[in-house]
From Swiss-Prot:
PROSITE patterns: AP2_ERF (PS51032). CDD domains: AP2. Belongs to the AP2/ERF transcription factor family. ERF subfamily. A motif (Nuclear localization signal) lies at residues 38-50. Transcriptional activator that binds specifically to the DNA sequence 5'-[AG]CCGAC-3'. Binding to the C-repeat/DRE element mediates abscisic acid- and dehydration-inducible transcription. CBF/DREB1 factors play a key role in freezing tolerance and cold acclimation. Disulfide bonds: none annotated. Residues 20-45, 141-172 are annotated as: Disordered. The gene is DREB1D. This is Dehydration-responsive element-binding protein 1D. It comes from Arabidopsis thaliana. One of its GO terms (cellular component) is nucleus. It holds the Pfam family AP2.
Length: 224
């Protein structure tokens, strides 16, 4: 079973006095839309807006999905609303289908037969309300699952960073090491400095041959 459909708020999807006419998943297997392929639309000049699998839903140009169901033995339809995702619209359809057709309903999701709260009457307003609640419960469930997955991924990434730091500290004997050469952007800086200290110092004296004077200069004269 898809995990997105596994759990819904107890206030709405509890098995209570308002349980689905298909009372228990073990009593019978509901007829699913996935096992009943749709016929191709007769119109050829228009874009197909129906979903290829889900019943009762159509896509608008805006990308959103609308849902409506035909009332049994009537030409009229019950409008269930516009939804941001096809799954929400498909879930709304299941509520209305169960309310109007009971066990003979063709469902989009197998668990709709026993998880959804079905209105006690076939009043269009009651069906619309129940369908809206089912769609919102589905949205809340998928949002919760998405947030949980993101939080788990973030926690796993943080744990990976901490594990890497711990292993690096163990390899260094618990002593923090800073690579000054990498920090200064001067590789082999200290090695070159050590080699320079082994060289003899440069000559700082001077040679009298380097003097450009015209003759010897006597500082003292004893002839006088």
């Amino acid at each position: 079973m898809n995990p997105f459909y596994s759990t819904f708020p107890d206030s709405f999807l509890s098995i209570s006095d308002h349980r689905s006419p298909v009372s228990d998943s073990s009593e019978c297997s509901p007829k699913l839309a996935s096992s009943c392929p749709k016929k191709r639309a007769g119109r050829k000049k228009f874009r197909e807006t129906r979903h290829p699998i889900y019943r009762g839903v159509r896509q608008r140009n805006s990308g959103k999905w609308v849902c409506e169901v035909r009332e049994p033995n009537k030409k009229s339809r019950i409008w269930l609303g516009t939804f941001p995702t096809v799954e929400m619209a498909a879930r709304a359809h299941d509520v209305a289908a169960l309310a109007l057709r009971g066990r003979s309903a063709c469902l989009n999701f197998a668990d709709s037969a026993w998880r959804l709260r079905i209105p006690e009457t076939t009043c269009p307003k009651e069906i619309q309300k129940a369908a809206s609640e089912a769609a919102m419960a589905f949205q809340n469930e998928t949002t919760t699952e998405g947030s949980k997955t993101a939080a788990e991924a973030e926690e796993a990434a943080g744990e990976g960073v901490r594990e890497g730091e711990r292993r690096a500290e163990e390899q260094n004997g618990g002593v923090f090491y800073m690579d000054d050469e990498a920090l200064l952007g001067m590789p082999n800086f200290f090695e070159n400095m050590a080699e320079g200290m082994l060289l003899p110092p440069p000559e700082v004296g001077w040679n009298h041959n380097d003097f450009d004077g015209v003759g010897d200069v006597s500082l003292w004269s004893f002839d006088e």
